[in-house]
Amino acid sequence: MQMEANDCQEEHKFTLDNYHVVEQVRRGKSSSDFVVLHDIEDKKYAMKKICLAKHTDKLKQTALQEMKLLSSLKNPYIVHYEDSWIDNDNNACIFTAYYEGGNMANAIKKARGKLFPEERIFKWLAQLLLAVNYLHSNRVVHMDLTCSNIFLPKDDHVQLGNYGLAKLINPEKPVSMVSGISNSMCPEVLEDQPYGYKSDIWSLGCCMYEITAHQPAFKAPDMAGLINKINRSLMSPLPIVYSSTLKQMIKLMLRKKPEYRPTACELLRNPSLQPYLLQCQNLSPIYLPVFPIKPVNSPKDKARRNSLPGKFGKERVSREKSEVSRSLENLYPFWTNTETGSSSSSQPASSTNGAEDKLETKRIDPSCDTLKISEFTSQKSDESLIDPDIAVYSTETPAEENALPKETENIFSEESQLRDVDVGVVSAQEVACSPPRAIEEAETQEALPKPKEQITVPISSVAHSSTEVAAAKDHLSGSLEGDKAKMVKLTASEMSSVLSKLTKLGPPQSKERADALECLLEKCAGLVKQEKYEELAGLLTPFGEDGVSARDTAIWFAKTLLSSDKLNQGT
């Protein structure tokens, strides 16, 4: 052993005579820490002296192993190794860099209860995790990770030091030696289990708790109380000024079972640490984020999107509209009554091949008997992009309302080939053909202002939509003639009554649904008393096994309500 010490001393440029002690920082049972000044370089170093005279050869071999280990560890967040040897008095002298900032324990005392900013704590945590992960990847455990061994070279940087107990882990014989019991002692060591990588994670969690709360995680007046608190994980709550993310990460590191604690590598992949990892030195690419981190919807991004050329802007607007439509279909799948159409507006209307296109009814004005269908074009700018559920009032004059049926027929018969058409208004009898969802939208959007002009929209399959409307009208008239009833022409007051009842078919609250079902049963009972079984069958057909669509349900329900109201008024 003495020959190895002499060989080790010959390899070094300086000897102990080139240093003189400035002050003694700490004194322990088997080691002491000093601040020394190098006479030639005029530079301060931290010296750790381990007394080996009263120890066995095994402990001396451990000291030599530690010095060899220190020489191989090179990381920006580990205290820089300077020199080491064994002197003639069997003292292992280990020289490391000295930092004027002191250690974390002194920084907490100097703060005097003033909490550190959360950004700084996250930055320290990221650097400490990088240091611990570097040690673990080299099969090294620190075994003495406390705030006194976390040094502050700069305000926002930390380094791990004091590897007096660090050892290479032997897979066949795990490390089980610990010295004393401290506030950061892990539960598995108290149960005489081997000290492993997860034990360092526990100690790091205790350090982060102390940095955050300015007090130890586990504190008791006696040793029995301390062991009881550690085993039961009894901790005071962290200050409320810190985010739940930081608190959760500290709690994860302080889980009692080692298998439930995350590794340093897993903690480094936490999204909250990504911005701080980007500022670290010599960062491994595995910890870099896949996508660059930037604020969402920042003013710069909005300005860039608004300044896109016309072609890209139109494509983006149409893409956003399609996404909105898909989200609405997923939100209201029961009321979605249309299929995806593949026909183009530039092709004839006969090329639809039976595919249905969406034709939404936007707004109903209760003061008149007209219904206006409107929709925004894809050429509108991003600022004018409005949710498709938002509707508009009809602004036709009374003179225009009288000519509504003719305008409607002309639109659906003569202008079906056009790309951009001015959609007219639908007669009052076609209200029953509208899906309940659209009618409900009309009821819930009454507070919106009325626009002053109509909006031109592209419709690819107007002919098919007109066919549906015509079929619904024929179906209504045929059913009424079969019952020897006359055609009913809605007035404004009757329109409001019908709409208020049809609205209950939508997806409202449970009370409104119960009222609608009660109204349905009352009408069915009235039809049975009047022996109108055909109308009763038509009313109940949508609720059988061969149920029809919501559109047909609205048609039959409206027809029954109107005919019943007329008969009641006649009697």
Swiss-Prot record:
Keyword Zinc annotated: no
Start-end of Basic and acidic residues biased regions: 312-321
MF (Gene Ontology): ATP binding; protein serine kinase activity; protein serine/threonine kinase activity
A Pfam short name: Pkinase
Active-site residues, record numbering mapped to chain: D144 (proton acceptor)
UniProt catalytic activity: L-seryl-[protein] + ATP = O-phospho-L-seryl-[protein] + ADP + H(+); L-threonyl-[protein] + ATP = O-phospho-L-threonyl-[protein] + ADP + H(+)
Annotated binding of ATP, by residue: V25, R26, R27, G28, K29, S30, S31, S32, D33, K48
Enzyme Commission code(s) on record: 2.7.11.34
Keyword Protease part of the UniProt annotation: no
Biased amino acid composition, Low complexity: 342-351
Domain Protein kinase: 19-277
Residues covered by region (Disordered): 298-321, 338-363
Alphabetical UniProt keywords: ATP-binding, Kinase, Nucleotide-binding, Serine/threonine-protein kinase, Transferase
Cited function: May be involved in plant development processes.
Similarity remark: Belongs to the protein kinase superfamily. NEK Ser/Thr protein kinase family. NIMA subfamily.
UniProt protein name: Serine/threonine-protein kinase Nek7
Organism, scientific name: Arabidopsis thaliana (Mouse-ear cress)
